[in-house]
């Protein structure tokens, strides 16, 4: 009998999630089509979490059940499914999954509800979501998720300025220094080598949990300084160009600086999370 009841509850929860899928597809519209396959797969996997956090599930009315133990609600079933799915996601990808849930919830809310800037709304949603999921699922969620999203505009601007040498080096806006007077073959430092050293030194001084955000800003600064014609021919050119810039920046900085950069860095770049990039260019 209990097995039959649980089967009914699971069916009801599945129906709730199916209704959510329709809402999701309507709410996302074109932005859903821009997502990469990995992001779409994670969104499908995390739909129970979206359903539960939006409380799109209600108590099941089954008067024939006699005990309170059997009076489970569809929300409890969806909560279990949410935690089960989150536990199956590797730790390094959980930030990515949580970002997707936040983005899904925000896009489904009426825009009139957000009286403050969209980014601040995302920060609050991310913080609340982290607290809820960590407690509800008793599961590890990287601290970087929260800290990285709580950077304010002024902090991002400071990171941007601090890593100006990295922007300069990655764009190769430095040239070899001509030193004609040495008569023996010795190392002749170039301005690029000096800028590279400054870049690595600045990056090493940034706390690990903020390095992803710093690299995002560097990549965005580089992308904004490139002629717009380079990005013609792509659908929604900004996002693919930004992804490629960040990927290349990560590879270059990891190899040349020999410092720890979180593996999670590439994940948040697959969303339209606002980034501050006000660097105005020029070699340092």
Swiss-Prot record:
Keyword flag Ligase: no
Molecular function terms, GO-annotated: nutrient reservoir activity
One Pfam family named in its UniProt record: Gliadin
Function noted in UniProt: Seed storage protein. Might be integrated via inter-chain disulfide bonds within the glutenin polymer.
Entry PTM: Contains disulfide bonds.
Signal peptide positions on this chain: 1-18
InterPro entries the record matches: Bifun_inhib/LTP/seed_sf, Bifunc_inhib/LTP/seed_store, Glia_glutenin
Organism: Triticum aestivum (Wheat)
Gene3D superfamilies documented for this protein: Plant lipid-transfer and hydrophobic proteins
Name of the protein this chain belongs to: Avenin-like b8
Family the UniProt entry places it in: Belongs to the prolamin family.
Keyword Metal-binding assigned: no
Classification via CDD domains: AAI_SS
Record's keyword terms, sorted: Disulfide bond, Seed storage protein, Signal, Storage protein
């Amino acid at each position: 009998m209990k097995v039959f009841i649980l089967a009914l509850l699971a069916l009801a929860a599945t129906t709730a999630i199916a209704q959510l899928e329709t809402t999701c597809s309507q709410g996302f519209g074109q932005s859903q089509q821009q997502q990469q396959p990995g992001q779409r797969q994670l969104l499908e996997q995390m739909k129970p979490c979206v359903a539960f956090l939006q409380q799109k599930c209600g108590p099941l009315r089954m008067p024939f059940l006699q005990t309170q133990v059997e009076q489970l609600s569809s929300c409890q079933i969806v909560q279990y499914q949410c935690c089960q799915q989150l536990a199956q996601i590797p730790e390094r990808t959980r930030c990515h999954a949580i970002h997707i849930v936040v983005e899904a919830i925000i896009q489904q809310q009426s825009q009139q509800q957000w009286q403050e800037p969209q980014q601040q709304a995302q920060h609050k949603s991310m913080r609340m979501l982290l607290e809820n999921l960590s407690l509800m699922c008793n599961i590890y969620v990287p601290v970087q998720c929260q800290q990285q999203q709580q950077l304010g505009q002024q902090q991002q601007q400071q990171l941007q300025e601090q890593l100006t040498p990295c922007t300069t080096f990655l764009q190769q806006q430095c040239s070899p220094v001509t030193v004609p007077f040495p008569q023996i073959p010795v190392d002749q430092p170039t301005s690029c080598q000096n800028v590279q050293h400054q870049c690595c030194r600045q990056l090493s001084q940034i706390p690990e949990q903020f390095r992803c955000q710093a690299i995002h800003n560097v990549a965005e600064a580089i992308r904004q300084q490139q002629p717009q014609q380079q990005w013609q021919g792509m659908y929604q050119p900004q996002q693919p160009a930004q992804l490629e810039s960040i990927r290349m920046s990560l590879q270059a900085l990891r190899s040349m600086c020999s410092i720890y950069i979180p593996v999670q860095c590439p994940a948040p770049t697959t969303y339209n999370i606002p980034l501050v990039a006000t660097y105005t260019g020029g070699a340092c």
